[in-house]
């Protein structure tokens, strides 16, 4: 993974995006924060994707360094860290939605819930409002 100072600045928005969050594990972490309510290291580790501990730790650190997520100590258990999307991270929700919709359309074995696909396609603003973390501003 590229640290923020190593992101290629060739002016291409796609290159910037891919260098900022474009690998498989980073996108799945963002998905899980947005749609599955994950917030702890254990949530991601036990999420069913099979991510290894070293890759998970690396991606969480990378996403934090790039301003996509933040981490804070859990007030109920100071040894546990709570991860949350920043405004910059939440702004990736439409990207995740579009990947989700594209896959739901073209993957013959999709397990995407039909209700969620329909809401992403037809009522995106309502879905964004529903999943927006309480601490983030409104747009």
Feature-to-residue mapping (PLM):
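C-terminal regulatory/oligomerization modules of transcriptional regulators
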Residues: 94-139
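A detector for short, charged/polar N-terminal pre-domain segments
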Residues: 1-9
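Basic, amphipathic "hinge/linker" alpha-helix immediately C-terminal to the N-terminal HTH DNA-binding motif
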Residues: 22, 75-98
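Short, charged/polar surface micro-motifs in flexible loops or helix N-caps
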Residues: 35-39, 62, 89-90
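A conserved beta-turn-beta hairpin within the catalytic core of GNAT-like acetyltransferases
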Residues: 7, 39-40, 77
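N-terminal helix-turn-helix DNA-binding core of bacterial DNA-binding proteins
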Residues: 12-52
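Canonical helix-turn-helix DNA-binding module
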Residues: 44-78
């Amino acid at each position: 993974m590229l640290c923020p100072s190593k992101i290629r600045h060739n002016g291409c928005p796609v290159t910037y995006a891919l260098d900022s969050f474009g690998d498989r594990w980073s996108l799945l972490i963002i998905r899980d924060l947005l749609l599955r309510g994950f917030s702890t290291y254990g949530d991601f580790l036990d999420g069913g994707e099979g991510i290894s501990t070293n890759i998970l730790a690396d991606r969480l650190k990378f996403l934090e360094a790039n301003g996509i997520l933040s981490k804070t100590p859990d007030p109920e258990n100071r040894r546990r860290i709570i991860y949350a999307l920043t405004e910059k991270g939440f702004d990736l929700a439409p990207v995740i939605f579009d990947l989700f919709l594209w896959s739901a359309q073209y993957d013959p074995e999709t397990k995407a819930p039909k209700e969620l696909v329909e809401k992403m396609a037809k009522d995106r603003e309502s879905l964004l409002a529903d999943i927006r973390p309480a601490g983030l501003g409104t747009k």
